Amino acid sequence: MEYKLVIGLEIHIQLGLRTKAFCGCKNEFGGVPNSRICPICLGLPGSLPSVNVELINSAILAGHATNSNIRHVVKFDRKHYYYPDLPKGYQISQNDKPICERGSLLIETSSGLKKINIIRIHMEEDSGKSLHLLDSENQSYIDFNRSGAPLLEIVSAPDISSGDEAVAFLTSLREIFRYLDLSECNMENGSFRCDVNVNLIITESGVEHKTPIAEIKNLNSFKSIKAAIEYEELRQKEEWVQFRKTLDSCGKHTRGFDDKNGVTVVQRDKETVSDYRYFQEPDLPLIEIDDFYIANIKKIKLIEFPFDARVRLKDQYGLSDFDVITLTTDKHLLRYFEEAAINASDPKKVANWILSEVLSVLNDKGISVLEFNLFPSYITELVEFIVAGKISGKMAKKVFLEMMSREVPASVIISENQLEQISDKFVIRQIVFEVLNENPKSIELYKKGKDHAIKFMMGQIMKKSSGKINPILANEILLQSLSNV
């Protein structure tokens, strides 16, 4: 039996706009329950929605970033379903005419670049949030603060073939939205949510069979998404062997992911389009957007996207794949590096220092690079001292700590404390000769193959120079001198 795993993703991204999609209420996470609502949020009789123009602008930018075709007429529809946290009984969304269609993203896989097509991007509003208390079986609460929050839904084509590819696509999409400042894309607070559609195409005796599509929900991390896909692949393969269920006979159903046990659990049959009874939203007019308007919106956010930045960084600075991926996860970190690298004699060493020492500080303090208290030029100068052999890497770390404490450049600290390494070969030879003359027994031990004698003599050299001698040069000159003794 041969089979192919087929995966499509539906991603909901809550936009970081100041106000909600169709009213003037603040669009913020958390807060006192039901403190940011109005008659429009609750669908009260007589309330009329109005479109937040920034929702349309955000959709245009998302379409541009994903190489999508952008529609010139915006139409909203009512999507009907009944949940306690949907007070109107319908959601304002887009059905047959999404604002963006036929886009794509390139992702990096183990076998190279792969194009993942995007079927559509459409605008809609979020629902409220139901809260079920563990200590109460008979009570639930509803917070409508999220009701009406602006969303974009991105629907990928079923071009994804593994859990790793799904995570790569989601990572790329998240980076783009963060680069554009459209959303925090934080799965913990619900601003980045993903449903995964999975099934298998099984080939037996030259005949293809499609297994029923499972739409998996309750996925709260990229790790969960990958685990759910891998579990579902095994489950559907076993189900085919036992029951030979097909897509034609069983259709599509919804499953939830049990993160604790690593399994998916049946929830319900999946609704069809007709179940939602779509029709055009009568309270919102058609909105026309011309090419000039779209071009102006694109110009506002004329930025380099992560994938393009990675290619450029490798070509321009010779950085590794790991380095460029890490640097481009945060556009502010990338900008910090480029400002530090612009006048550096060795940009790769600057990158190494930022990705090790600077990132370590940021992670320990739980801050972003925007809150870091050293200018990029300070890092450049510190690395130049290392490259020139004026201070050791070990000493540089001590200098770095004092730089952060005092918020002064490395040159000030090195000058005040006379920390500059001795790299003059003539001076180093003099110190080496002194140590050799004072330690004839160590020379004899070295000749007998005792390696610890070298370590002892290097220790004496460092002691005589108060730790300021260049250890690499000192070791070279010591070995040369011993070969001539």
UniProtKB/Swiss-Prot annotation:
The keyword Metal-binding does not apply. It holds the Pfam family GatB_Yqey. It is an enzyme of class 6 (ligase). Its EC number is 6.3.5.-. Keywords: ATP-binding, Ligase, Nucleotide-binding, Protein biosynthesis. InterPro entries: Asn/Gln-tRNA_amidoTrfase_suB/E, Asn/Gln-tRNA_Trfase_suB/E_cat, Asn/Gln_amidotransferase, Asn/Gln_tRNA_amidoTrase-B-like, GatB, GatB_Yqey_C_2, Gln-tRNA_amidoTrfase_suB_CS, Gln_synth/guanido_kin_cat_dom. Belongs to the GatB/GatE family. GatB subfamily. This is Aspartyl/glutamyl-tRNA(Asn/Gln) amidotransferase subunit B. The lineage of its organism: Bacteria, Pseudomonadati, Spirochaetota, Spirochaetia, Spirochaetales.
